[in-house]
Amino acid sequence: MRNTLANKIKLGTKTLISDPCYDKNTWCAGEVNTLPGDYIVQEIAEMGKHPTLKGLFVVHSSQYEKIDYSDCYEDSLIDVGVDSGECGIYDSEKYPEDGIGFDASNRGENYAIYRAPDGDWGVTAGNFGGDGSYKAYLHRNGDGKVDAIYLDFTMGGYGEYDDEEYDEEEEDLEEE
């Protein structure tokens, strides 16, 4: 279940964990102090007839052989809100103030994972439905800097969009 697709990104001293549709100051994004450098990106997937993306793991290249996603711990201060059905990890200094607009043609074929527009300062995973949130798990080195991040897409809560419920709400508003 590990390393189904590995890529590299570069992160600075501050890293943003967010839905890319949000601006930098959105309450449901998280920013952490990270060990700067190259990070290996891994999809954690359940393989089979219909592969399912279970999580996204980034680990500093110096720790790649030492740290697994199961070594990360929940950071209760980060509630990663998801509105666009996407969630990612980005270098805070390069993340646009008003969020990222993506071209859907950049999506990967298997698990809808793709990089940020300039190719090296972040990674986004998508195709999760709509509104909700996901847990961010962190690993910190001896200096307290984050050197690995695991986004768990199996433990999040997001409500499925209910067309009938929405239509009923719209009808009620029209009647008033």
Where are these regions (language model features)?
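Intrinsically disordered, low-complexity acidic regions enriched in Pro/Ser/Thr
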Residues: 1-176
